[in-house]
Amino acid sequence: YNTAKNLNIGIVLTAHPTEVKRRTLIQKYHSIIEILEQRNLFKNFPAKLKILNKRLFDELTIIWNTDDLKRVKPSPYDEARWGLAIIEDSLWDTVPKVYRRLNSIFAQNMKKNLPKNFNPIEFGSWMGGDRDGNPNVTADVTRKVILLSRWEAAKLYEKALTKIIRSYSMEKCSKKIQNKVGKSFEPYRVFLRPLRDKMRVTHRSIEQHLVYKKPIDQKKLLNSREEILKPLRIVRESLEQNQNENIASGELLDLMRRAKCFGINPVSYTHLRAHETREDLVCR
């Protein structure tokens, strides 16, 4: 148990174009998984199976007729964009599932739950930071890639928060939330909307800057992981105080674990300058 609590796993996403699957194909693979799951669910319903088999055939036909690789050399910005798509299409949902599965194993075998702040996995990347191997990677490219990463994170958090806000229609809440929102039949929704709105502002401001070169007002953006976690902790404490531990350990806990893992940038960026370092060493 203590070994698991102290795990520290660093995973680095490469920017090499030969290791990047086309997002179109990744989405097709997800569709096939969904169809296969539905086929198992409706195995005793011939009419439904016929429809699912047609969908499966269509998806496979499209995949067979789709090129695995893009035939145009990608820019460093494109490489980063494709890499971030992996987070949205796979890692964003996979990370909390892994933690939840691991927690189930410990709960079953050791009668202990993992700490609520359990977060052994961190993602790193040198997409947009490869100053050693790619002469097209400049300081401006790195800056844009980091902004793109923040844009991606804000978009994902906004979507997750919107889902929770729609779900949390409960009226009973803690005094801390009540003092913040005043009299409300939907205190959790009122309390979480400012955070969701700030995600939306962050997402749209960065998009306007990257597309139309509009200046960014950093004061209006989400600037730290703690800005996400603090209100979520207050909501979790309120739910636990009102005998709603099962709700607190559901989508809210998943979102908190995502926030701990990904922060405001889904990956931490490393600048590779090994070639310049070796040259400097030889000169000395």
Regions found by a protein language model. Give the residues of each.
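Often metal-dependent polyanion-binding catalytic scaffolds in large enzymes
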Residues: Y1-R278, R284
